[in-house]
């Protein structure tokens, strides 16, 4: 049975993006260690999963990109979950139109490497709400938005996670992953957690220094996976 990994950037106050869908933080892609962590994760995927909006954003960038991220995004199979998308022109892409739980169940039963989901917010929220995520890999950004598109919304019950691993990079970002079972590959660096049957006394403590710096350049979702 394949695991489903939700991998995304997130602000320290829990938002995937600002209300205008921008990501007003440094994505860390200029840092070699962060780049390697992302590439290792992306290349290890058996399939990339995403909602319609994220698919349209990525499909407009990766097919013609010369970025190091382009090859795994173009070559590894992709599944876009949408009931309205008529066709998917990005090679190696198919559309899943059925019930989300049933579609994910079928994908998990297929042989191959883990499934990695990237968003957008509505898709990520649905995966969490239905209990379909086995592992969270969250690149926690040292930025607070105050309002935006949250990762968790309308959960039927509190979701308790067990910390497995945490790493902070020179950019200030802390990759954080919540997994239910298997460990991450040793080349991956992240804060990792697994589902916990009951609340933990202390999951993690992260300290950030406050600066007057603000990132005014909003990078598109497809800037990094």
Regions found by a protein language model. Name each.
Residues 1-132, 142-201, 205-208, 212-214:
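Portal/gating segments that form or line small-molecule/metal binding sites
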Residues 216-224:
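Short, intrinsically disordered C-terminal tails of secreted or membrane-associated proteins
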Residues 135:
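Short, conserved catalytic or interaction motifs in soluble domains
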């Amino acid at each position: 049975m394949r695991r489903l990994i939700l991998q995304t950037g997130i602000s320290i106050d829990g938002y995937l993006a600002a209300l205008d869908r921008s990501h007003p933080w440094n994505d860390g892609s200029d840092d070699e260690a962060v780049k390697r962590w992302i590439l290792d994760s992306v290349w290890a995927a058996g399939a990339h999963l995403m909602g319609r909006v994220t698919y349209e954003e990525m499909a407009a960038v990766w097919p013609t990109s010369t970025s190091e991220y382009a090859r795994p995004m173009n070559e590894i199979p992709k599944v876009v979950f949408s009931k309205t998308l008529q066709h998917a022109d990005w090679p190696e892409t198919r559309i899943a139109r059925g019930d989300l739980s049933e579609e994910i169940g079928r994908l998990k039963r297929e042989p191959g490497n883990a499934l990695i989901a990237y968003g957008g917010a509505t898709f990520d929220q649905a995966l969490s709400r239905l209990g379909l995520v086995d592992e969270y890999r969250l690149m926690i950004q040292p930025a607070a938005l105050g309002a935006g598109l949250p990762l968790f919304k309308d959960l039927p019950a509190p979701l308790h996670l067990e910390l497995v691993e945490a790493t902070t990079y020179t950019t200030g970002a802390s990759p954080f992953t919540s997994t239910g079972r298997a460990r991450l590959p040793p080349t991956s660096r992240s804060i990792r957690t697994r589902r916990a049957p009951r609340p933990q006394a202390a999951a993690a403590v992260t300290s950030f220094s406050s600066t007057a710096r603000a990132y005014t350049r909003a990078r598109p979702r497809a800037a990094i996976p």
